[in-house]
Amino acid sequence: MIQTCDPPRTLGLRRLSAQEFCTLLQKETSSIYRPHSEVLRMVTVGEVWGLCAPSRQLLAAQPVLPMDADLALAAALRACRGWRGIEGGYFLAPPVGAQDPAQLVAATAARARQLARGRQVLAVLDPGAQQLLPLYLGQGFALRALRPLDSLAPCFVLTAGTATPRREPVWVPLEDRMLLARQLAKGYAALDSRRRDQSIWLGMYPV
C-alpha cells in the first residue's frame, strides 16, 4: 500500500501594517513596545516583518529600524554605543510572537544589512530572551554589551560583522551575569555558544 504525504507547510514572510503589528503586540509584555505611540513611530520610520502560516495567520514579527530614528530605543542605543561608527546604520528590535523566530531573524538580519549598505547593524534582545542568543550568534552577531536601555532591565546589545580571532575563547555560562558583565567590560565579545548540561555557555573573545 502506497502512502501519500501532504507537502510541508512552509511559513511566509511579509511586511506588516501598523494594525497587524499592534494586534500581535496585545499579548506582548516587553516594555520596549510601550507606549503605543512609540510602536506607531517604529512602523512609520522603519519596517516590520512578519512570519505567517499558510493560513496567513501572523505568528511572529520583528522591526528593522534606522539608528538615527526619533525613537527611545534608538536614542538609548546611540548613547550606549556612541554615535560615531553607527550613523546611518540599522538595528533589529526584539522579535515578538510565539513562533520560533529563526527564519524571521535570518530574514530581518539580511534586510538590515541591505538597508545599512555597509554601515553598522545592531540588535537588541530583552533579558528574558537569552535563549535566542545562540540564534543571533549563528547569524553573525556578537554580544558586545549587557546594560539598561531607556530605563529597561539590562538588555543584550549585539553588533554584526565582528571577525572571530584566531585564539581559544573563554567560556562563560550565560546564567553568570556578573562574570559575563566583567568579560564584556574588559573588551571581550561573545561570538560563539554551546550547550553544557542544559545550560548555554558563551565563547568570549577579545575584540
Which positions does each model-derived feature cover?
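C-terminal "cap" of GNAT-fold acetyltransferases
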Residues: 149-173, 199-207
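Conserved GNAT acetyl-CoA-binding A-motif
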Residues: 112-127
